[in-house]
């Protein structure tokens, strides 16, 4: 984020702006019938700096840049005559190419003009432009002068805060060649900063004069589509699947999308696609066991918990690491069995904190508590209850197979394959009576029995403690051919 901008600062939010978009002609004579051959002669006194990258492919041509300077004056003259305030309205204008067509974006402060009347004023602005700029010749371009609305088709007038400009328009998420003019001096400070960061290649600033900025050439530019796809990849790599997690990690990228038209829709779409990408390409272990800081394993609460419960920490860590890596074969489930207060839920909760897509299943397997957990990276089966009616489905789920659970005649839910954590106060095998069923469970579960209640001063296990413990254990892996019960140290 720009260091000089606080998006909650009153300066960046108090003023409200409307946005006009004017489409320019790709061929002047064809799309503005009747225009005279000496149309541009009246612009001969307009001073426009020349830079080498102005003539790069995709940059707005000099005709359009020159035309924009005049159109801005025409619109502002109309606007300031309509407002009831003594000072000229604040404004920001940006010229660029969109899909090969030149365009002008103009944000104007709403001082003295109700937003409900913008439609009427836009119609009048079209007429003024045709009369005073196009010499009475109406452009033959669909929707050539429009204002931003809250909906794509219809809706009310969309208003913007000043922060929309630095977060959305000055960022390289729009077409890469942009010219801009403004009478808002504070935006000059923003331009100074992004110029130092080499986002723009040319920048002129004069006191009390329009500002002009010329973004860097296409080598460093990136389209909105590419930026959006890159954002999805970034979300997937970091396991970000909620808006809160996104804001905590990088509010700048969140704000860049939010300030665009229909930004909330783009944010939800990006998170939805990121979730699907994570489900299809990642494992739970991909989000765990990544530590780049020094630590003492003997001070780690997970290590201390397994020692307290008389387990070998290396063996326990090896089992958990292989289980999360889908390397346990049929053994797709770890169960933590013990009385309340033994630490099983605290340990499980810390594991799940590291994994972006997880589900919690309570009690017995039924349609009500399955629908929400179609495809997750880890499933916590809390207070697991096993009944004979669904045993084949339960066996497949605990064994790491994909199951399709019928909801009704026309609907179903798919679960797995994903690692399972089962917690209970009683041994899972005691829930079935058939020896065959007990054998099936033994083949699919690593069972940890926690028989000691942790002391009151025992440290709370955090998500980073899980990371440290598994990072330590992965390089100390040992053979763990265990039938069902994880052995304890005498």
UniProtKB/Swiss-Prot annotation:
UniProt keyword annotation of DNA-binding present: yes
Domain of life (superkingdom): Viruses
Stored PROSITE patterns: PV_NS1_NUC (PS52022)
Disulfide bonds: none
Domain PV NS1-Nuc: 1-210
GO CC, alphabetical: host cell nucleus
UniProt entry tagged with the keyword DNA-binding: yes
Pfam families for the chain: Parvo_NS1, Rep_N
One MF term in the entry's GO annotations: DNA binding
Gene3D superfamilies: 1.10.10.950, 3.40.1310.20, P-loop containing nucleotide triphosphate hydrolases
GO biological process: one example: viral genome replication
Subcellular compartments: Host nucleus
Keyword terms: DNA replication, DNA-binding, Host nucleus, Nucleotide-binding
Name the UniProt record assigns to this protein: Protein U94
């Amino acid at each position: 984020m720009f260091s000089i901008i606080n998006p909650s600062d009153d300066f960046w939010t108090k003023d409200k702006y409307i946005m006009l978009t004017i489409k320019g002609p790709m061929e002047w004579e064809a799309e503005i019938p009747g225009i005279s051959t000496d149309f541009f002669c009246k612009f001969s006194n307009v001073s426009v700096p020349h830079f080498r990258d102005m003539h790069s492919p995709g940059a707005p041509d000099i005709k359009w840049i020159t035309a924009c300077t005049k159109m801005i004056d025409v619109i502002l003259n109309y606007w300031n005559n309509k407002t009831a305030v003594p000072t000229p309205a604040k404004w920001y204008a940006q010229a660029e190419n969109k899909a090969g067509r030149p365009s002008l974006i103009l944000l104007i402060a709403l001082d003295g003009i109700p937003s409900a009347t913008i439609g009427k004023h836009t119609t009048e602005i079209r007429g003024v432009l045709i009369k005073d700029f196009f010499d009475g010749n109406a452009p033959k371009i669909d929707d050539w002068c429009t204002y931003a609305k809250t909906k794509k088709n219809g809706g009310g007038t969309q208003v913007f805060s000043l922060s929309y400009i630095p977060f959305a328009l000055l960022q390289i998420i729009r077409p890469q060649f942009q010219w801009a003019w403004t009478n808002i001096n504070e935006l000059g400070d923003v331009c100074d900063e992004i110029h130092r960061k080499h986002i723009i290649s040319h920048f002129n600033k004069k006191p009390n004069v329009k500002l002009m900025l010329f973004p860097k050439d296409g080598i460093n530019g990136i389209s909105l589509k590419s930026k959006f796809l890159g954002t999805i990849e970034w979300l997937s790599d970091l396991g970000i699947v909620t808006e809160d997690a996104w804001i905590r990690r990088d509010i700048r990228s969140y704000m860049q999308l939010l300030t665009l038209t229909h930004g909330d829709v783009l944010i939800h779409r990006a998170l939805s696609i990121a979730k699907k990408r994570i489900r299809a390409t990642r494992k739970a272990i991909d989000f765990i066991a990544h530590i780049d800081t020094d630590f003492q394993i003997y001070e780690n609460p997970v290590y201390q918990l397994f020692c307290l419960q008389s387990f070998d920490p290396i063996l326990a860590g090896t089992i958990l690491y292989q289980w999360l890596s889908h390397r346990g074969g049929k053994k797709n489930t770890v169960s933590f069995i013990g009385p309340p207060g033994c630490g099983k839920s605290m340990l499980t909760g810390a594991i799940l904190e590291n994994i972006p897509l997880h589900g919690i299943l309570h009690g017995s397997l039924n349609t009500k508590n399955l629908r929400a957990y179609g495809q997750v990276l880890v499933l916590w089966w809390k207070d697991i209850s096993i009944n004979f009616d669904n045993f084949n489905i339960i066996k497949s789920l605990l064994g790491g197979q994909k199951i399709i659970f019928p909801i009704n005649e026309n609907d179903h839910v798919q679960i797995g394959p994903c690692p399972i954590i089962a917690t209970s106060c009683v041994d899972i095998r005691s829930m079935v009576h058939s020896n065959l069923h007990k054998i099936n469970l033994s083949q699919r579960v690593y069972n940890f029995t926690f028989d000691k209640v942790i002391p009151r001063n025992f440290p709370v296990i955090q998500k980073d403690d899980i990371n440290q413990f598994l990072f330590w254990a992965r390089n100390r892996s040992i053979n763990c051919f265990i039938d069902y019960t994880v052995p304890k140290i005498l």
